[in-house]
Each structure stands twice: as C-alpha cells, then as structure tokens.
Amino acid sequence: MKTLADAFHHTLKDIYYAENALTKAMPKMISAADGDVKSAFEDHLKETREHVKILKKVFATIDKPAEGEKCDAIEGLIKETEGIIQEASGKALGACLIGAAQAVEHYEIARYGTLRQWAKELKNDEAHDLLSQILDMEKAANAKLTGIAVAAA
C-alpha cells in the first residue's frame, strides 16, 4: 500500500470479509445462547447482514468490486468463540459469549472508526456517511451487550 486510498481499499476488504464471516459464525452463537443474549445475537445478525449491504455501497463509491480479503483477526476471534461454545456451560457460557461478542464489536468499532476518518481525509463524503451509519450501529450493539452483562451480574 502506497497511498491512503490503497489503505482504505485494503481495510475495506478486510472488514467486508469479517462481516461476511460473522454472518456464518453468529448462528452458532445464537444456538448456544439463551434469553437476552440470544435475542441480542439474533438482532445483531440482522444488523450484520445490513452492514454487508452498506459496505457494497462503500465499495461503489471507490469504483471497486465488493470483495473480501482474509482477516486473520476475525478468524481468531471466531475460533476463540467456537472454543467457548465447546468448553463453557451454564451462566459462564452466557458471560463468555458476551465477552467474545464484545471483542468482535471492539475490533469492528476500531476498523469502522479508522475507515470513516480515512473517508473524510479522502473527501469521500458518501463513504464517510455510510461508514458512520455502521459505526453507530456497532457502538449501539456493544452498549446493548454491556447492558445485558451488567444486568446479569
């Protein structure tokens, strides 16, 4: 990567891969969870599918095809979550699933915050607005998970 535009495109492909990977991983989390945690995961799966649609629009703003590039970070977080599902049970399972989901949210918040700022620097107002929408949704999802964790404590 030699330019900010290159970095933007690379990171956009990274988060696109991550969101698509999450749409495949989240059903396992939903199956393992119950109560408010399950409901929050179901809601977030719907939002994640919406994020993929919005990201396609961001790709269009830079005249690039919507395609992912393997994201080792999200693969690691998904693998960790799969281990939690196999090893944890009872109240610990719910708490660990919330922690795993928040690790994903924090990764996404960092990526979307970076992309949004880069879109601003690249004077791509449409991408900035679209990425702001997703960033706001990710922050809200994280806050919802925090609320569930606090209520369960």
Functional labels for PLM-detected ranges:
Residues 1-153:
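Amphipathic alpha-helical hairpins
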